[in-house]
Every structure is written in C-alpha cells, then in structure tokens.
C-alpha cells in the first residue's frame, strides 16, 4: 500500500490556496498554456523523477505508455485518454486544458507527464509548487513529432530501448501510409474543412498549425480554411469562399452533434461542394487528432473516407 505523503500535502495546501484565490478571475481558454511553462524540448523536467506512480495527461501520451507496456505505473489519466479501453478504468483527473490540482493530488502520484498545451498555467504552477515532478512532452503535428514524442515518453520512463523498438514499428507504418497519400496528384487533392463545433449555428473551424490541419495534409488533402492560425469562427462568406469538398468532424457518438442533413442545411454550408455530395466524414477524436502510435491508421482511414479508394500507385 502506498502511503500518502503528508509533507507534500502541506505544500499542496498552500499552493492550492493561492490557486483558489486566483480562479475567480480565470477564463476558459482554447489556446495552449504559456510558453514559459512549456519547454520547446520534447521532454522537460527538473530532475529524474520516480516514475513508479504517474498521472498521464494527454491521450497520445497515455497511448504511448500502454504501447510501451508500462501501463502498470499509471495511477490516473485525463479525460482525453480514451485508448486503449483499459485506460478508462483509471481515475479520471479531468480535461487536459482545465485541470484541477486537487483531483491529481488525490491519486498521490510520484510524477506527472503531460502533453504540451495542458493547463491552465495556474493549475500547473500549483502542481509544481507541490513538489511533484512534472514533465512536458512536446507536440508537433507531423511524422517527426510522433517519433520524438515516443522517444520522449520512453526517456521519461527510463525505457529507451522499448521506445526505439516502437519508433521503428510506427515509422514503417507511417512511411507506408504517407507514401500512398503523396502519390496523389496535386490536381486531384480535395479541399477538407475541419469543423470543431457548430454551437448556435456558428462554425468553429481549423486553420493552420493544428492537429486537424496536420492530419488533413498527411492524408493527401488540402485544408480548405488554411489562411489563419489555430481555430476561429468563420463567417458565412469565408465558408463559401473556402469551397470545401469534404467536411471533417470528430465523432462524438450517440445523439451528440448534428446529422448530415442538419449540418448541410446551415446556410453557408448549403452552398459548398461538400453539401452537393453530402460529403461528411466523422472519426474518433483521439484516433484522428492524437498524433500517437495509431496515426498511420488514421491517415489511411481518412484517405479512404475522402477519396473512396487507394491511389493507383498503391494498388
């Protein structure tokens, strides 16, 4: 049985008190945490931590830990960590961008490993003040970023040999998937609009520098709204001008989200090429946007959903 560290608790209580005083003035944010709290390196920590009991923040990070066969160290995970199914049995410490320190402290972790962009900054500050080793894993939305992420998690866990074996397997799979996407001629590439949400009829879409933009490009398509960074609401005029051939969304399951008929009934979308062919693709969010070990599978699935069949070069 692991005893709770009461010396750590006292440090945490002081830090949490400061956090509680600041929270009334916090606003939820879609943006990543401040760069002062996230190292550009793929793994940043103050010292080599004890990783016998870890909380994993970020679906791809958790997935990598399982792929490395080191899941026995996990004592908690965030709400985006939905794969593999076994991860759902772990205590859920909340959404990666809206973490509450007390939920993480409650599972008594020896260390925390989190994907870049986790937050809010005030919560991360509380966790660091509680003297819990905190490691950030960097994020880029390309093949190199996926492989670096695996190596960084392997280094954090102290299993670099396992990480290199996984890198080799994932790299081969990615190279095959990317070769198929690259074989498609530029003139044949379809324009894809990723829609994050349609709240109150407002289309929140992906521009550049996002996981959505990255996976669209890796699948051999064009980001139809690639003229701005991050996510933002689009005007009706901007949607019509984007001329998407395909609409891409996360599959939220059940009755959540609009049906294809409801979506394409929205005035701006009704005027797009995608509406004429009812071209709507929904995929599991972590699989599509996680940029973890299964990304090659996501590339193939999205490529097939967009184009219907493989290119001649891959047949």
What residue spans do the PLM features occupy?
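Bacterial N-terminal signal peptides that target proteins for export
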Residues: 3-29, 35
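Boundary at the C-terminal end of the N-terminal hydrophobic targeting segment
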Residues: 29, 41-43
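Short secondary-structure boundary segments
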Residues: 58, 116-117, 139, 228-231, ...
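Short helices/loops that flank or line small-molecule/ion binding pockets
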Residues: 101-108, 130, 235-243
């Amino acid at each position: 049985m692991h005893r709770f560290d009461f010396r750590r608790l006292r440090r945490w209580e002081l830090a949490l008190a400061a956090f509680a005083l600041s929270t009334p003035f916090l606003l939820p944010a879609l943006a990543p945490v401040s760069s002062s709290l996230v190292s550009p390196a793929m793994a940043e920590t103050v010292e080599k931590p004890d990783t016998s009991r870890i909380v994993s923040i970020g679906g791809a990070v958790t997935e990598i830990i399982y792929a490395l066969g080191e899941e026995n160290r996990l004592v908690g995970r965030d709400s985006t960590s939905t794969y593999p199914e076994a991860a759902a049995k772990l205590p859920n410490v909340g959404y990666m961008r809206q973490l509450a320190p007390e939920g993480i402290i409650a599972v008594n972790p020896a260390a925390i490993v989190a994907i870049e962009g986790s937050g809010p900054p005030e919560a991360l500050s509380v966790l660091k003040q509680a003297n819990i080793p905190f490691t950030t894993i960097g994020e880029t939305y390309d093949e190199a970023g996926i492989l670096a992420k695996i190596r960084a998690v392997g280094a954090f866990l102290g299993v670099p040999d396992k990480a290199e074996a996984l890198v080799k397997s994932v790299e081969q799979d990615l190279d095959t998937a990317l070769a198929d996407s690259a074989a498609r001629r530029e003139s044949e590439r379809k324009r894809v609009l990723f829609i994050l949400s349609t709240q109150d009829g407002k289309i929140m879409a992906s521009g550049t520098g996002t996981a959505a933009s990255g996976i669209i490009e890796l699948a051999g398509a064009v980001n139809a709204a690639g003229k701005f960074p991050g996510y933002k609401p689009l005007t009706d005029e901007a949607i019509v001008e984007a001329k998407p051939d395909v609409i891409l969304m996360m599959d939220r399951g059940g009755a959540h989200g609009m049906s294809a008929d409801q979506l394409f009934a929205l005035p701006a979308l009704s005027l797009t090429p995608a509406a004429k062919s009812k071209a709507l693709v929904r995929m599991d969010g972590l699989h599509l946007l996680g940029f973890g070990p299964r990304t090659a599978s996501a590339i193939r699935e999205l490529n097939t959903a967009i184009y219907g069949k493989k290119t001649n070069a891959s047949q």
